[in-house]
């Protein structure tokens, strides 16, 4: 777990009325080394909102998991499955970490990436389609109010996740440069790559060797097992191969050396 960290921030309810439907909280906001300000947020409400952005795909993934593990759908907790939206966000954060490894102070914070990605997501069923849709659409959800750039908290209008951009405009500039680089690395360059080896090399430049090697090795193993078990599908002429059936997909027949 040395690659992960957890931020812990003390907070209290926003009001003294402890009602179960009131989930707003009051927290401290660091202005500088010795000054703090009151701010408000609603992480529980945010989580519920995030789940609504992928509710149909989340339900589908839970049904698949339940069937494969012989469980009732109600018994499948959300954390046991991952949607294309969640995986796309993971990839964007990894790309962010590599891109800003020598400029960490200007890296976009995770809540900005997560919020814009969730707003731009349109229910795509594959990770690649999701990340293309997100990268091509997330900028339109950045508002400019009286000259101030705003990434609004969807469950608390007064909270601007990009408030530091006003104080540190170089962070805003860095964000837009990163978006353009991510579009190149995830969309333009892969489309021009010839062969899996070339594709893997392209991804290693922006995501690192280890995760790309793991992903491509697992992909090869999954494709082999899926074809052997009759669960490999082809989508159209250019849609590629996948291990889950979807609309328009054709089952790939098993391969033998004797033509049967």
What label would you give each PLM region?
Residues 68-191, 195:
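Conserved nucleotidyltransferase catalytic core and NTase-mimicking acidic/glycine-rich helix/loop elements
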């Amino acid at each position: 777990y040395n690659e992960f960290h957890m931020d812990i921030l003390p907070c209290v309810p926003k009001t003294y009325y402890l009602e179960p439907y009131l989930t707003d909280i009051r927290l401290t906001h660091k202005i500088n080394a010795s000054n703090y300000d009151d701010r408000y947020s609603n992480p529980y409400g945010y989580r519920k909102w995030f789940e609504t952005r992928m509710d149909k795909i989340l339900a589908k993934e839970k049904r698949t998991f339940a069937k494969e593990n012989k469980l009732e759908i109600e018994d499948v907790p959300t954390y046991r499955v991952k949607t294309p939206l969640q995986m796309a966000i993971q990839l964007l954060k990894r790309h962010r970490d590599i891109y800003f490894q020598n400029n960490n102070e200007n890296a976009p914070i995770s809540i900005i990436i997560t919020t814009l990605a969730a707003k731009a997501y349109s229910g795509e069923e594959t990770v690649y389609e999701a990340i293309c849709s997100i990268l091509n659409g997330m900028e339109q959800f950045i508002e400019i109010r009286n000259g101030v750039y705003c990434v609004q908290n969807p469950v608390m209008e007064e909270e601007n996740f990009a408030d530091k951009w006003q104080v540190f405009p170089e962070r805003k500039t860095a964000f837009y440069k990163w978006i353009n680089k991510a579009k190149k690395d995830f969309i333009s360059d892969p489309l021009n790559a010839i062969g899996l080896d070339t594709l893997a090399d392209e991804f290693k430049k922006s995501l690192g060797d280890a995760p790309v090697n793991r992903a491509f090795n697992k992909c090869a193993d999954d494709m082999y097992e899926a074809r052997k078990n009759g669960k490999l599908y082809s989508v159209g002429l250019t849609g590629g191969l996948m291990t889950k059936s979807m609309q328009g997909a054709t089952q790939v027949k098993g391969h033998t050396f004797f033509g049967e």
